[in-house]
Amino acid sequence: LIFTIDRIMCQGSWLDYGMFVQNVMVAARARGLHTCPQVAFLQFHRIITEHVGAPPNEMLVCGMSMGHADTSAPINALVTERAPVSEFARFIE
């Protein structure tokens, strides 16, 4: 999947767009599919936007792979460490 956004959209729209992309990922999982959002596609933005026929006012946000994960592939066994919530959030009671 290739995601683009109109260049005139302001910062708040980028937040909305991120939530939209996340919901695509959640919907995919609900249907048994795996996803991998990929911002690395941005380095090829000129080639990609031209290839998909995006108008000049659209800019590339990200790409996303979607399908069935190969659970036997060693790369799919990678589990990264997560910071505890207390490192980035403070709860006020």
Residue ranges and their predicted role:
Residues H34, P55, A69:
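Gly/Ser/Thr-rich beta-alpha loop segments that engage phosphate groups in nucleotides
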Residues T49-P56, N76-L78:
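Short proline/glycine-enriched turn/loop segments at secondary-structure junctions
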Residues L1-H51:
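Small-aliphatic-rich amphipathic alpha-helix that forms the alpha element of a beta-alpha
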Residues M59-E93:
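C-terminal helix-cap and adjacent tail motif
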